[in-house]
């Protein structure tokens, strides 16, 4: 009887882990670039939230003399 219970418990653990993995893999992130001449992280986060209805966030990065804001948000917005 204990062997059947062990096999059932292992099967249930694998099933639950498989269902959780399916839910976390479905969330894809999209990106958007806001080009600016100057950028700070607080302003960047605010701009991204305004543009994408409160979803996602942003961070600044610099390419040569141009600082830009890179927004990341769920693709289903």
Curated annotation (Swiss-Prot):
Primary site of residence: secreted
GO biological process terms, semicolon-separated: defense response to fungus; killing of cells of another organism
Keyword Chaperone: no
Disulphide-bonded residues: 30-75, 39-60, 44-69, 48-71
Subcellular location, record wording: Secreted
GO (cellular component) term, any one: extracellular region
Keywords: Antimicrobial, Disulfide bond, Fungicide, Plant defense, Secreted, Signal
Transmembrane parts of this sequence: none
N-terminal signal peptide: 1-26
Family the entry assigns: Belongs to the DEFL family.
Protein name as catalogued: Putative defensin-like protein 120
Organism: Arabidopsis thaliana
Gene, per the UniProt record: LCR56
